């Protein structure tokens, strides 16, 4: 074996010993690089005669081609080995049982809101909607809240650092009553000039915001307020609506209602509404579930209506609290933490 055959054998051995592309490139440099062994052979031809250069050059070029062929073959072998390793790592066992696709579900509070809308819808109530950033006027003034009322303070209400076009302060709505005001004013304007105004029956469900957070309060919570305005609407109608609603919502007739005198700036007289179950884990306990009352004449006037002619009642309840009562949940914050282990129980 001459020196060139020995060189080819050495290159083939080094290429075969390389187990990674980086090692193979290092081996290539030792034989085919600028300072490699083949390059050194070419440089050594300077002292040869023209005939010797011709013969020697042809032999060296043949040797270089054999080394390059060995290099290409090893590159392909390493690439194939890498591909096979990747395929093995990503192999899919088609005999394994399939994974069931996860099925989503409505949030329990969303279920409650839908249920509230369905029940009141069956009683002829419309559903109002409105902005979550409201003016101070719609949130407080229109509802007969005096300027010095504690609810207007930044300790209770989230104010936005800007005013509306009329210069009135803006805030995150602390209740959904502003939607009732907007609805009633639009209703009054739509039927202006008519001898008789069609009754206003509307509920206003949605998110509200207050500076409060504990096991039974959240800075963001849901509220549903209702309004029924007409010429002959009384507390008797309010009691009838509440009785039908709560018995339908909790799916039981074994339920009592109690109205306790209270105070709200926007109603007069006002009453808290309690319910008591005749059976079940809450049997015998009076539970506060809503506030209500006859709409204050000043509020009726702000609706754009004549309080001497039109009368009615308003009420407000917390869908979050109703959800807690319905499902036996003690901590309101669980509904808003996004823990699927908790929420998946309500599918």
Swiss-Prot record:
Its EC number is: 6.1.1.20
Biological process according to GO:
phenylalanyl-tRNA aminoacylation
Q: Where in the cell is it found?
A: Cytoplasm
Q: PROSITE patterns from the entry? A: AA_TRNA_LIGASE_II
User: What positions does the entry give for Mg(2+) binding?
Assistant: 268
Transmembrane feature ranges: none
Q: Which keywords describe this protein according to UniProt?
A: Aminoacyl-tRNA synthetase, ATP-binding, Cytoplasm, Ligase, Magnesium, Metal-binding, Nucleotide-binding, Protein biosynthesis
Source domain of life is Bacteria
Q: Kindly list the GO CC terms recorded for this protein.
A: cytoplasm
InterPro entries, from UniProt?
aa-tRNA-synth_II (IPR006195), aa-tRNA-synth_II/BPL/LPL (IPR045864), Phe-tRNA-synth_IIc_asu (IPR004529), Phe-tRNA_ligase_II_N (IPR004188), Phe_tRNA_ligase_alpha1_bac (IPR022911), Phenylalanyl-tRNA_Synthase (IPR002319), tRNA-bd_arm (IPR010978)
Q: Which cofactor does it need?
A: Mg(2+)
Catalytic reaction list: tRNA(Phe) + L-phenylalanine + ATP = L-phenylalanyl-tRNA(Phe) + AMP + diphosphate + H(+)
Which enzyme type, at the first EC level?
A: ligase
Keyword field contains Zinc-finger: no
Molecular function, one GO term: tRNA binding
Entry note: cofactor: Binds 2 magnesium ions per tetramer.
Subunit structure and binding partners? Tetramer of two alpha and two beta subunits.
Give the family per the record.
Belongs to the class-II aminoacyl-tRNA synthetase family. Phe-tRNA synthetase alpha subunit type 1 subfamily.
PANTHER family listed in its UniProt record:
PHENYLALANINE--TRNA LIGASE, MITOCHONDRIAL (PTHR11538:SF41), PHENYLALANYL-TRNA SYNTHETASE (PTHR11538)
Name of the molecule in the record = Phenylalanine--tRNA ligase alpha subunit
**Taxonomic source organism:** Leptothrix cholodnii (strain ATCC 51168 / LMG 8142 / SP-6)
Species classification: Bacteria, Pseudomonadati, Pseudomonadota, Betaproteobacteria, Burkholderiales
Which gene carries the instructions for this protein?
A: pheS
